[in-house]
From Swiss-Prot:
SMART domains: HAT, TPR. This is Pre-mRNA-splicing factor prp1. Interacts with brr2 and spp42. GO terms for biological process: mRNA cis splicing, via spliceosome; mRNA splicing, via spliceosome; spliceosomal tri-snRNP complex assembly. It comes from Schizosaccharomyces pombe (strain 972 / ATCC 24843) (Fission yeast).
Length: 906
């Protein structure tokens, strides 16, 4: 019975039929089924809009875009004729732009460098972060590298598939037999289809023509490869570059035999295909030398000499590879083939041991090369007699008149009069040579004619400008530096006086000259720096900055007389500069010339009658020399004529030192009427009452001061210390009031922490320190206290955190140095102490610790160096140092005595 399949798929559906509706699969309608919500524009309106847009675009294209921007003037006159005046104007504008770009170039480059370093420091590269780890990789051996495990695939998906990929099964014998039979059938089929490919031999063996064809193809490929090197058509391989690459293939040692064989074949191919190429022979010989086959290397290089007899390199290589006896024979053949080669003649001279033979070779060389400067110099050097050398040089300058070295050498061997003639002749021959003029100036300096040196240099510069041989300014300064290093100081100064202002604008020359002097000082050319300052001061005699720099230079590298000499000139040029008078008086006082110091300050009063510093300097001189009455009279006069706050405080301090407390209090009352808001007056008043053990009056003085001067930190600290003697609780109240008036102040927090430490409140100390570091994260004093509060094992970590917060703080750097010192790392400690004093030379605390370290861990030279640097720096600030210097008991002590006192108290 046949099955019936309904053919409804090919039938027409009934009306209103919706597929799937019977099973509830209803469809949905989108906006695209309904059509657009708005009516589309008509074809006419679309065409009209397109035409209108085309007309707008054409109008926009008619307007040149460069006329749209009123600030853009590019090509406004492009259609105008370009004549000579326009070209000259463009050159002028170009020169102006170049000049503007050169101005402040060094400052601009320095600023850009600082910004770059700051950016690199804030955004370090990954390579720089791991630089120290990379250096450690150099210690790994090849075995360590080979033992590094391969990275595994740790993804979950591939980790599950990995065992399946690495699962192996043994192949069945049936598969192997089938594969063997299949290969045999294919080979039989290939043999049968080629009629006559195998011919039986007379002895019954068969000839395999398939193998013969494969061998023939291999031989043909080798021949084609060899023939390709002889092609005359253009090639993409550069022959010189190819030989260079062959040289680079020479192995560094004889261990890699495979590379040696490969390089030997390549180089053999090179010298066979192109036997006239010298580099191939040299490379082949060096390869054999590296392979420890010296005889083969010698044989190869001799063949190279036969094939490339016009090549210097091949002959020089042959000389190098052979012993001295054989090398002499080779060099003899070489100079016969290349008699014009100066290098070969000089090499022949080196092979000789006796001076007579050397001279003979050089003379023979000069017959073929009479214009070789190197040969003439060698001939002169070989002569032991000055007269013979002079004769040779005279002949040399006749043959080579443009060699300035030969002229100068001849002038050095002549007498003074003859040397002048030689230099004049050299000047006439080589009119663009500056060396001749410098040599003439040095000749006059050697004869003691100092006045003629600068005249010669001035004339030389003018003639060089006329003949086009004028050097750049920097080149002249280099010549001056060279003269100083060779002992010609007067000539160096003459060069600077003549050429320092060459090519400089008036507005740039001041800063440029300061930079020149600083660069000379950095290179230890002190006389050149002196000459720069002397020239600059002639141009700017009223510049206080220049005089101070010159005085500083003399204090470092000159004598007391030279310092006083330049200070005398300075005060004559700048009589209103207080600092110059003070330095001058101090220099005289340092050499115990008290009368001279008084005389200098007396002269200073004539120009600076109201100068506070000069008054106080005069008082200091009298006080140090125990002239107390004269000091009182000077201060009384100063209070009338100047009457500044410092003069009043010095007057009160003098009375305190002399133990005249009542007179000091009387002066204080008078001073407070004039300066009621000067905090030091209240501090001194409280201290006087403390000395008199009148605690209540001292407290009243401090309280009155804090009301009038609430932002004076030392005043609050004195009040807190006074209250601490009575009660720690009252001192805390003082600190709280002070912190309200002066938030985020490191000194208040530090004294509070130290007070709690003295009271033994460790928990309070740690809480206060944590809050202090939150308010003052860049305080070196607070970080120092935090480091010393940590156990010894954790101090290094704490110091690392501190360096991130306040790098460059002198207190912190000194603390790190002390830590290293405690760990017996003396050299590292010294380097950190040097960093600390460099960060802040006015910090007396750092100098105290540095000197104490030098006394215990340094040698005598280091101690003297620290002491000298301390006296030069003359520090006045710090946390601990002012308590030593401002103590009235130490008022008459010298800085060295104060330093020794401080390190004993530390």
């Amino acid at each position: 019975m046949a099955n019936f399949y309904p053919d409804f798929l090919n039938m027409q559906p009934p009306p209103n039929y919706v597929a799937g509706l019977g099973r509830g699969a209803t469809g949905f309608t989108t906006r695209s089924d309904l059509g657009p919500a708005q009516e589309l524009p008509s074809q006419e309106s679309i065409k009209a809009a397109i035409e209108q847009r085309k007309s707008e675009i054409e109008e926009e294209e008619d307007i040149d875009p460069r006329y749209q921007d009123p600030d853009n003037e590019v090509a406004l006159f492009a259609t105008a004729p370009y004549d000579h005046e326009d070209e000259e104007a463009d050159k002028i504008y170009q020169s102006v732009e170049e000049h503007l770009s050169k101005r402040r170039k060094s400052q601009r480059e320095k600023q850009e460098q600082l910004q770059k370093e700051k950016y690199e420091k804030e955004n370090p590269k990954v390579s720089s972060q791991f630089a120290d780890l990379k250096r450690g990789l150099s210690t790994l051996t090849d075995e360590d590298w080979n033992n590094i495990p391969e990275p595994g695939d740790l993804t979950r998906k591939k980790r599950t598939k990995q065992p399946r990929r690495e699962r192996f099964y043994a192949t069945s014998d049936f598969v192997l037999a089938s594969a063997r039979n299949e290969n045999q059938a294919i080979s039989n089929f290939a043999v049968d289809t080629q009629a006559g490919t195998e011919t039986p031999d007379m002895n019954g063996t068969k000839t395999n023509f398939v193998e013969i064809g494969a061998a023939r193809d291999k031989v043909l490929g080798i021949k084609l490869a060899q023939a390709s090197s002889n092609l005359t058509s253009p090639s993409t391989i550069d022959p010189k570059g190819y030989l260079t690459s062959l040289n680079s293939m020479v192995p560094k040692n004889a261990n890699d035999l495979g590379d040696i064989r490969k390089a030997r074949k390549l180089l053999q191919s090179v010298i066979e295909t192109n036997p006239k190429h010298a580099s191939g022979w040299v490379a082949a010989a060096r390869l054999e030398e590296v392979a420890n086959k010296l005889s083969q290397a010698q044989s190869l290089i001799l063949k190279g000499c036969e094939n490339c007899s016009r090549s210097e390199d091949v002959w020089l290589e042959a000389i190098r590879l052979h012993p001295a006896a054989e090398a002499k024979v080779i060099i003899a053949n070489a100079v016969k083939k290349l008699p014009k080669s100066v290098t070969l003649w000089l090499e022949a001279e080196k092979l000789e041991n006796q001076a007579q033979h050397k001279k003979r070779i050089i003379k023979k060389a000069l017959e073929f090369n009479p214009t070789s400067v190197s040969l003439w110099k060698e001939a002169v050097n070989l002569e032991e007699e000055v007269d013979n050398a002079r004769i040779l040089l005279a002949r040399a300058v006749e043959l080579i008149p443009m060699s300035i070295d030969l002229w100068l050498a001849l002038a050095r061997l002549e007498t003074y009069e003859n040397a002048k003639k030689v230099l004049n002749k050299a000047r006439q021959t080589i009119r663009t040579s500056h060396e001749v003029w410098i040599a003439a100036a040095r000749l006059e300096e050697q004869q003691g004619n100092v006045s003629r040196v600068e005249k010669i240099m001035a004339r030389g510069v003018s003639e060089l400008q006329a003949t086009g041989g004028m050097l750049q300014r920097d080149q002249w300064l280099s010549e001056a530096e060279k003269c100083e290093t060779e002992g010609a100081v007067i000539t160096a100064q003459a060069i600077i006086n003549t050429c320092l202002g060459v090519g400089l604008d008036e507005e740039d020359q001041f800063d440029t000259w300061l930079d020149d002097a600083q660069s000379f000082i950095a290179r230890k050319c002190i006389d050149c720096a002196r000459a720069v300052f002397a020239f600059s001061l002639r141009v700017y005699p009223k510049s206080e900055k220049l005089w101070l720099r010159a005085v500083e230079l003399e204090k470092l590298y000159g004598t007391t007389e030279s310092v006083c000499s330049i200070l005398e000139k300075a005060v004559e040029s700048c009589p209103k500069a207080e600092i110059l008078w003070l330095l001058y008086a101090k220099e005289r006082k340092n050499v115990n010339d008290i009368a001279g110091a008084r005389n200098i300050l007396g002269r200073a009063f004539e120009y600076n009658s109201n100068s506070e510093e000069i008054w106080l300097a005069a008082v200091r001189i009298e006080f140090v020399n125990n002239e107390n009455e004269r000091a009182r009279k000077l201060l009384a006069r100063a209070r009338i004529e100047s009457g500044t706050e410092r003069i009043w405080t010095k007057s009160i301090s003098l009375e305190r030192i002399l133990d005249e407390k009542d007179r000091a209090l009387q002066l204080l009352e008078n001073a407070l009427k004039i300066y009621p808001h000067y905090d030091k007056l209240y501090m001194m008043k409280g201290q006087i009452f403390e000395d008199k053990e009148q605690i209540e009056l001292a407290r009243d003085a401090y309280l009155a001061g804090t009301k009038v001067c609430p932002y004076s930190i030392p005043l609050w600290l004195l009040l807190a210390k006074l209250e601490e003697k009575q009660s720690v609780i009252r001192a805390r109240v003082v600190f709280d009031r002070a912190k309200v008036k002066n938030p985020k102040n490191e000194f208040l927090w530090l004294e509070l922490i130290k007070m709690e430490l003295r009271a033994g409140n460790i928990s309070q100390v740690r809480a206060a320190l944590a809050k202090a570091l939150q308010e003052c994260p860049s305080s070196g004093l607070l970080w120092t206290e935090a480091i010393w509060l940590e156990p010894r094992a954790q101090r290094k970590t704490r110091a690392t955190d501190a360096l991130r917060k306040c790098e460059g703080n002198a207190h912190l750097l000194c603390t790190i140095a002390r830590m290293l010192w405690l760990e017996k790392k003396a050299d590292k400690a010294r380097s950190w102490f040097l960093k600390a004093v460099k960060a802040d030379q006015d910090n007396g605390d750092v100098w105290c610790w540095f000197y104490k370290y030098s006394l215990e861990a340094g040698n005598e030279d280091q101690q003297k160096e620290v002491l000298t640097s301390f006296e030069t720096a003359d520090p006045h600030h710090g946390y601990f140092w002012p308590s030593i210097t401002k103590d009235i008991k130490n008022s008459r002590k010298t800085p060295q005595e104060l330093l020794h006192l401080a390190i004993n108290v530390l």
